[in-house]
């Protein structure tokens, strides 16, 4: 008798994706982040659902409803901080997942890579809208500043901003629609994840060597299921420690003050995971130029597959490219630091230099170094 998991119409889809899936035998821990992102998404949807049961999306009561969740709802504070810090974990895993893709040349699977970029934008939009919901000072002013960037679009900019706001300023209509979209988007993300996996399973996984591994495959279960579960335990332990010991470590103290349109905070800044893009935005003195640079800082990933000039797929055996990759990581950390600093000397010039180096490294240095390595290897 054939196993039910191989014959049942629904179970055989699960079986071919998570049980009998042939996987390369050499996958390192860097391949754990995809499944960790799945866990993050599940945690965010579940905690978000329970938070939505107690939250009110009205400017008069939004801030108080979050306070009520933390003080009066059973374990409401756990839900709230799991959701807030879960977002940070989500982005840590996202950036490491993208970094893995860049390092090991996974971007050559262009369909999977492009859906991944779409997912990155969707998650960023979701996180931005979620940050507005507690209706604290940084929520209000962050929403005002970031949505206002759309006014840089020629001709339709101003009308577009007012259309998004639902009025002439960030107000009740804005908060209500942001709540609606913040609730909807994670399900769109979940659907995109399915497409992401569909394209990935068409080609099969890449591996650290970048060499086709068709001759050396092992079943996903039990080898990688147990490896993924270990990853889940490590990540959930880290998240629990963050939530229970220092839940406000990554937040902004200004967000514990109710939104006040008459009082601007001294430094308006987004959550830490957007600071690198915010630094690139601020480093350009022109509004439209800044907005374009902001979008391109993520969209540049879409042209990385076209700039792959190396004869090897992975950076595993390319020491010069490895140096350049870690240089790029250092630039991104510098930009993250600059994004949280005030707009004054020397931070402005450091931000401008780091922004230029960020684009130069991806668009110019990496392709050139790859060509140089080809010549050194006499290929």
Curated annotation (Swiss-Prot):
Give the cofactors, semicolon-separated: heme b
Q: What is the effect of changing residue 369 to T?
A: In strain: Isolate TK 43176
- Binding positions for heme b b562? 83, 182
Q: Which residues bind a ubiquinone?
A: 201
The cellular component terms of Gene Ontology attached to this UniProt record, alphabetical and capped at eight, are: mitochondrial inner membrane; respiratory chain complex III
Gene3D superfamilies found in the cross-reference section: Cytochrome Bc1 Complex, Chain C
Output the Gene Ontology terms for molecular function: metal ion binding; ubiquinol-cytochrome-c reductase activity
What is the annotated localization of this protein?
Answer: Mitochondrion inner membrane
Q: State how changing residue 253 to Q affects the protein, per the record.
A: In strain: Isolate TK 20579
Q: Which Pfam families match?
A: Cytochrom_B_C (PF00032), Cytochrome_B (PF00033)
Instruction: Supply the alphabetized keyword list.
Output: Electron transport, Heme, Iron, Membrane, Metal-binding, Mitochondrion, Mitochondrion inner membrane, Respiratory chain, Transmembrane, Transmembrane helix, Transport, Ubiquinone
Q: How many and how are cofactors bound here?
A: Binds 2 heme b groups non-covalently.
Q: Where does heme b b566 bind?
A: 97, 196
User: How the protein sits in the membrane?
Assistant: Multi-pass membrane protein
Transmembrane domains' residue ranges = 33-53, 77-98, 113-133, 178-198, 226-246, 288-308, 320-340, 347-367
Q: Name one GO biological process term.
A: mitochondrial electron transport, ubiquinol to cytochrome c
Q: What do we know about how this protein assembles, alone or with others?
A: The cytochrome bc1 complex contains 11 subunits: 3 respiratory subunits (MT-CYB, CYC1 and UQCRFS1), 2 core proteins (UQCRC1 and UQCRC2) and 6 low-molecular weight proteins (UQCRH/QCR6, UQCRB/QCR7, UQCRQ/QCR8, UQCR10/QCR9, UQCR11/QCR10 and a cleavage product of UQCRFS1). This cytochrome bc1 complex then forms a dimer.
Q: Family assignment?
A: Belongs to the cytochrome b family.
The miscellaneous annotation reads: Heme 1 (or BL or b562) is low-potential and absorbs at about 562 nm, and heme 2 (or BH or b566) is high-potential and absorbs at about 566 nm.
Question: What is its biological role?
Answer: Component of the ubiquinol-cytochrome c reductase complex (complex III or cytochrome b-c1 complex) that is part of the mitochondrial respiratory chain. The b-c1 complex mediates electron transfer from ubiquinol to cytochrome c. Contributes to the generation of a proton gradient across the mitochondrial membrane that is then used for ATP synthesis.
UniProt protein name: Cytochrome b
Which organism is this entry from? Glossophaga morenoi
Q: What would be the name of the gene that encodes this protein?
A: MT-CYB
């Amino acid at each position: 008798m054939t196993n039910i998991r191989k014959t049942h119409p629904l179970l055989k889809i699960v079986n071919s994706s998570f049980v009998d899936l042939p996987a390369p035998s050499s996958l390192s821990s860097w391949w754990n982040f995809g499944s960790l992102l799945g866990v993050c998404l599940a945690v965010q949807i579940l905690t978000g659902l329970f938070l939505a049961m107690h939250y009110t999306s009205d400017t008069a009561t939004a801030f108080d409803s979050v306070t009520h969740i933390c003080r009066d709802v059973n374990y409401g504070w756990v839900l709230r901080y799991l959701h807030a810090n879960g977002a940070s974990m989500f982005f840590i895993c996202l950036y490491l997942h993208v970094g893995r893709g860049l390092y090991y040349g996974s971007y050559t699977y262009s369909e999977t890579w492009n859906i991944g970029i779409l997912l990155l934008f969707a998650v960023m939009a979701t996180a931005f809208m979620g940050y507005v919901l507690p209706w604290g000072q940084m929520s209000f002013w962050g929403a005002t500043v970031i949505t206002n960037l759309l006014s840089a679009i020629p001709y339709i900019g101003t009308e577009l901003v007012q259309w998004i706001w639902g009025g002439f300023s960030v107000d009740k209509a804005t908060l209500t629609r942001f709540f609606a979209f913040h609730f909807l988007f994670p399900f769109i993300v979940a659907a995109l994840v399915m497409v992401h996996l569909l394209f990935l399973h068409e080609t099969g996984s890449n591996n650290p060597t970048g060499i086709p591994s068709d001759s050396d495959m092992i079943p996903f279960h039990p080898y990688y299921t147990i490896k993924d579960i270990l990853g889940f335990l490590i990540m959930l332990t880290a998240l629990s420690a963050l939530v229970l010991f220092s839940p406000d470590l990554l937040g902004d103290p200004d967000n514990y003050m109710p939104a006040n349109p008459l009082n601007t905070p001294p430094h308006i800044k987004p959550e830490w995971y957007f600071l690198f893009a915010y630094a690139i935005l601020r480093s350009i003195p022109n509004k439209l130029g800044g907005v374009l640079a902001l979008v391109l800082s993520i969209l540049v990933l879409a042209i990385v597959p076209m700039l792959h000039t190396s004869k090897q797929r992975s950076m595993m055996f390319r020491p010069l490219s490895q140096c350049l990759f870690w240089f790029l990581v250092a630039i991104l950390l510098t930009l993250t630091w600059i994004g949280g600093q005030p707009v004054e000397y020397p931070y402005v010039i450091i931000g401008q230099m780091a922004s230029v180096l960020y684009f130069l490294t991806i668009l110019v240095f990496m392709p050139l170094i790859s060509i140089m390595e080809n010549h050194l290897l006499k290929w």
